[in-house]
Amino acid sequence: MKKTCVALILALSLVVSALGIQPSNAKAESNHNPVVLVHGISGASYNFIATKNYLIAQGGDRNDLYAIDFVDKTGNNLNNGPQLARYIDQVLKETGAKKVDIVAHSMGGANTLYYIKYLGGGNKIENVVTLGGANGLVSSTALPGTDLNQKILYTSIYSINDQIVANSLSRLQGARNIQLYGIGHIGLLSNSQVNAYIKEGLNGGGQNTN
């Protein structure tokens, strides 16, 4: 009887293997790029807690959400750009993805554009969403990137009530620019309306006419 049971188990194992059935705890392949969250001056990864919680509640995988902590909290492009480049390379290696998406707040927008423009990030990013981004300190236009088959799509979200970063710095020529009202600079990190636009931007709802 024991030999019969063993034989049945082996037979079932062969059938499962032949059908390509995977164990139930195997990680499903993600249909989305990993998202890198980039904070601004004096910020930190925890600034994006509300953003992460929203994306997870909308069906996002928490394992696809990465938030950098810059060593230099002053927003210096010369320091933060290279650190961001190393961080993104690490995320791509860890996940096996070809590109990442970025959500950047304040000076994080400028750091992101610096990485794209000067540090080889032009073919490693698919979607960029900036929140009150100081984008104009690096570029006033939506940089197309270096992937000839796919431009980087941008969504720039900013508020007329932002007292920290001028709207003129946040606007990107050729991007999808979204001007909101009644939200402060820090409030952009936790506003439900902003979160909805972030989701759209990460799902290819941005624009690049350049």
Language model features by range: what are they?
Residues M1-C5:
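Bacterial Sec-dependent N-terminal signal peptides
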Residues V6-A18:
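Hydrophobic helical h-region of N-terminal Sec-dependent signal peptides
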Residues V15-N31:
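Sec-dependent signal peptide cleavage junction
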Residues S24, A28-E29, K124, D147, ...:
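Intrinsically disordered, low-complexity
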Residues N33-H39, Y46, I56-R62, I68, ...:
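Serine-dependent carboxylesterase/thioesterase catalytic core
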Residues A44, K73-T74, L137, G187:
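Alpha-helix N-cap/loop-to-helix initiation residues
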Residues A50-Y54:
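Typically the conserved alpha-helix immediately C-terminal to a functionally engaged Cys/Sec
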Residues P144-N210:
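C-terminal catalytic-base region of ester-bond hydrolases, centering on the histidine
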